[in-house]
């Protein structure tokens, strides 16, 4: 503990020194520019940093292929032109127009997102690209019969930035103002990335289905990403229009979008430091190629091709630079790791044995399926299934491949709505609820094929599961309000406690490792810990011992029993290893073709003629 506090204090000092150095550089940089041309490039670089970070929220954090982003940039610019120029003879102050245009642009982002985010991949890209092209056509053609946009001639003679009646016309002052807002966006991006919102977006990017199964409201989060990116783009558009004192349709065309995407991809999708570096490099480097005309634009493509060949993850990648976790355990941790070959006699066990309650099976139904049927076209995957899982019971489902076991999990967890029948949890009808609502009710699951968030750390994988239990929004996160700080402390406490149940396999230096760096067995353990971190009452484990060797299978078997006996979980298990089923089960249900063949204790079900026939086939006469 003391060592961790010392490390944290050291990191804070490093960050303070780094921030001071960056502040000094930004303060003196305008005076180091050789002429006004390079001062303008320096100022525009700050603007591109804002734009790249705004796109990084949508494409980098949330993984959405948004091709309408440049239109939001334009909406912000033209909003300033409408409200602070002679065009409509309206001259609102900059400090009023800036938040107003950002909010208006965010509204457009929300509207576009609410109508298009049910689409994915290429279809989303096509719709958002169409929006950007329609916006460009409106800019070009809304100059008659009433001149709204100025057409191809744009709108000029915009008001310069003014504060309380004092106009800012100095190029150096403009550079300070734009870089001031760029720094705010950088700092805000860091805070968002490390928060519940950042973890939710990253989970969606990694695996949208798994994210929702861990309690993330994916629709709302994608809308928030769209709106947040549009807000930043709108603010950048306002700053651009006030700096240039004019706006034209070709300021917001498709090549501009390509440049911004290049900045994000060059730096590394999702990596804030990398995106800032990408924006700086691609703002300055092409200026050295300006004399070559058409070849200047080709440089962007060439840079991307070389980067994709040599470093597909971008300059900084996604996690490595920002992750302060150790790559290898130190001597002390190595000792713990070697001493913890028995999964259940970890330091946690030795420290707090007295607080562990013992539970017995209850008679109260926790989960109940009533005549549930699921059809996929002409195929009936589940056929009139009824079952009850009692409080603190382990109920195992067995059956050959294709029997409908995982489909039952998908029905209970809300991935599929049943064709017929009802699902009840603790007496409440949860039929038709979305996965994140099912998680909030108290049901969590693992998957037959591992669905971890591979590029997220072990600790962040578990933290995602607390999403539905927390409420902090962007304002609370950006200003680190007490509610947000309290939720983060509670999230860390809960997730570290659940990971700690697996001892050194998922704790210590492993907290900061990517999930993909774990062994297969530890990935299985992490998926169980992640499900437990949702504060679930019912765990649905889909083949938890799959891929494990005999020793690992024994360990996970004992751990599942411990979840029931020591921690009071109710558990529904799908398992093909019958020795595991026999060891852990209070009751067993056998399925075949979606129908219940037998139900009872292990021996009754294993010796049932129909179950034997389902596994081995019908005996010939």
Give the positions of each predicted feature:
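Helix-to-loop junction immediately C-terminal to a conserved catalytic motif
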Residues: 413
């Amino acid at each position: 503990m003391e060592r961790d506090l010392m490390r944290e204090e050291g990191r804070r000092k490093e960050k303070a020194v780094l921030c001071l150095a960056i502040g000094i550089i930004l303060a003196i940089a305008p005076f180091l520019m050789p002429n006004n041309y390079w001062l303008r490039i320096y100022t525009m670089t700050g603007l591109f940093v804002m734009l790249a970070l705004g796109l990084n929220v949508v494409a980098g954090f949330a993984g959405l292929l948004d091709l309408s982003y440049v239109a939001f940039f334009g909406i912000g610019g033209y909003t300033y032109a409408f409200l602070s120029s002679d065009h409509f003879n309206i001259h609102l102050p900059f400090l009023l127009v800036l938040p107003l245009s950002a909010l208006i642009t965010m509204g457009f982002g929300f509207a576009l997102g609410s109508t298009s985010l049910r689409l994915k991949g290429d279809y989303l890209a096509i719709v958002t690209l169409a929006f950007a092209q329609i916006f460009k056509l409106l800019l070009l053609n809304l100059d008659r019969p009433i001149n709204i946009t100025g057409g191809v001639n744009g709108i000029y003679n915009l008001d310069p930035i003014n504060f309380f009646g004092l106009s800012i016309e100095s190029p150096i002052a403009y550079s300070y103002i734009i870089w001031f807002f760029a720094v705010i966006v950088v700092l805000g991006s860091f805070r968002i990335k490390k928060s519940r919102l950042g973890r939710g977006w990253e989970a969606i990017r990694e695996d949208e289905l798994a994210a929702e199964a861990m309690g993330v409201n994916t629709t709302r989060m994608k809308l928030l990403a769209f709106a947040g990116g549009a807000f930043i783009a709108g603010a950048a558009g306002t700053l651009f229009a006030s700096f240039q004192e004019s706006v034209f349709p070709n300021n917001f065309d498709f090549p501009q979008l390509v440049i911004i995407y290049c900045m994000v991809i060059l730096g590394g999708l999702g990596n804030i430091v990398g995106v800032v570096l990408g924006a700086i490099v691609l703002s300055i480097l092409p200026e050295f190629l300006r004399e070559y005309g058409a070849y200047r634009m080709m440089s962007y493509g060439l840079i991307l091709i070389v980067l994709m060949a040599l470093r597909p993850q971008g300059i900084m990648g996604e996690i490595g630079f920002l992750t302060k976790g150790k790559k290898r355990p130190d001597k002390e941790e190595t000792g713990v790791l070697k001493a913890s070959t028995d999964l259940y006699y970890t330091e946690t066990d030795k420290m707090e044995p007295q607080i562990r309650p013992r539970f017995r099976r209850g008679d109260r139904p926790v989960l109940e399926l009533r005549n549930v049927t699921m059809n996929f076209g002409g195929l009936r995957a589940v056929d009139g299934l009824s079952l009850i899982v009692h409080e603190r019971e382990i109920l195992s489902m067995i059956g050959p491949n294709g029997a409908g076991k995982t489909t039952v999990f998908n029905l209970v967890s809300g991935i599929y709505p049943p064709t017929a029948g009802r699902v009840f949890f603790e007496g409440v009808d949860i039929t038709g609820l979305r996965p994140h609502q099912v998680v909030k009710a108290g049901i969590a699951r693992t998957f037959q094929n591992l669905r971890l968030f591979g590029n997220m750390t072990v600790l962040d994988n578990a933290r995602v599961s607390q999403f539905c239990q927390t409420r902090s929004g962007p304002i609370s996160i950006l200003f680190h309000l007490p509610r947000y700080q309290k939720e983060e402390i509670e999230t860390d406490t809960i997730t570290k406690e659940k990971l700690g149940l697996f001892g050194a396999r998922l704790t210590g230096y492993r907290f900061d490792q990517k999930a993909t760096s774990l062994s297969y067995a530890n990935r299985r353990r992490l998926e169980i810990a992640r499900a437990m971190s949702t504060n679930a009452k019912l765990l649905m484990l889909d083949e938890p011992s799959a891929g494990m060797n005999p020793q690992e299978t024994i360990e996970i078997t004992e751990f599942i029993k411990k979840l029931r006996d020591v921690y009071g979980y109710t558990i529904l298990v799908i398992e093909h290893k019958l020795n595991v089923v026999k060891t852990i089960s209070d009751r067993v249900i056998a399925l075949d073709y979606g129908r219940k063949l037998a139900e009872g204790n292990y021996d009754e079900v294993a010796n049932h003629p129909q179950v034997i026939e389902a596994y081995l086939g019908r005996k010939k006469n």
